[in-house]
Amino acid sequence: LPKPPGEAGGLNITLYAFSIMKESLEKAVYPGFAAKWKVEHGENVRFTSSYAGSETVTNQILQGVPADIAILSIDRDAQRLKDKGFVTSDWHALPYKGIVNKTPFVILVKGGNPKGIHDFPDLAKPGLKLIHPDPISSGGAQWSILAIYGSELIKSEQHSGEPDQARALQTLHAIWKNVFVTPASAREARTTFELGNGDALVTYELEGLLMKESGKPVEIIVPRATIFSEHPVVVIDRNVSPQKRAVVNAFVQYLWSDEAQQAFVKYHFYSVTNSAFNDANKEFGHIEMPLTIDYFGGWDKAYPEVIEQIFKNKVKSRK
């Protein structure tokens, strides 16, 4: 007969996450939680993980993969899981509205910055080859579009007192004309760039810092104004067995512990609980005008108004 959970075999948590969570989870957060649970409960905890673009992860869960927990790039994906009955608990009632970490959007260029890229509008230079993840499969791609569009809005607002939507649309359109490949996730986009393709990549700052750490000849260009992506955790209630509920809930709460937040900072996410933790990472770039999703009125407005109406209808369809 199979052993009940908690006996010799221990407990297994299945976690699906958007692509850039891999290093921090596997190298620090999982081992930290497993050690804590072992001391407190005498049980072994193992983790089974899968990583892909946030939209892809969400679709996989909707198609029936046995995830207990998901960490997603965008809140809208969590809402999709709730709408289909996979998530019944309210992740916004968790600490920090369910957001476990954040990271700003930047531009990666080749060593020496041969194309002279200093801000988002420079990505519209004629002949430039831009790598950009696919907004259909990647949450990071949607954050990137909001970063570019929002950056132009807030700069024009600072200059004239009014956000210039026409200018923001024009800039986004001109940049998108230079996109020559759209990998399925932020991590696949980084791999494409690492292999020597393209002149620039818009992505999470974390990706650039990991590349630099591994000795790759890359420069990180921090735009004057850019968005911080904020990443929610959700429990896939439909999939969590009663025997696993306690350990799943404990792991979710652990994500806001000092230990986990400092681990995220070590692997180049910003902490959401304590800004002093972020001072430990000397690699973070200075952002003159930081944006959040609140600038757009949250995902409920940002997705239909910017991703659907502006990007899909006015930019992508007219490339």
Across the structure, where does each feature detected by a protein language model lie?
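Early extracytoplasmic/lumenal segment of secretory-pathway proteins
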Residues: 1-84, 93-94
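Extracellular/periplasmic juxtamembrane helices and adjacent flexible linkers that interface
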Residues: 6, 238-319
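Solvent-exposed coil/turn segments that connect beta secondary-structure elements
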Residues: 18-20, 54, 64-66, 74-77, ...
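Alpha-to-beta junction loops
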Residues: 64-70, 127-128, 195-200
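A conserved helix-loop-strand patch within extracytoplasmic ligand-binding domains
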Residues: 82-155
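Short beta-strand->loop
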Residues: 90-100, 212-227, 239
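Residues embedded in well-ordered beta-strands
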Residues: 106-108, 219, 232-234
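Ligand-binding pocket segment of bilobal, Venus flytrap-like solute-binding proteins
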Residues: 155-223
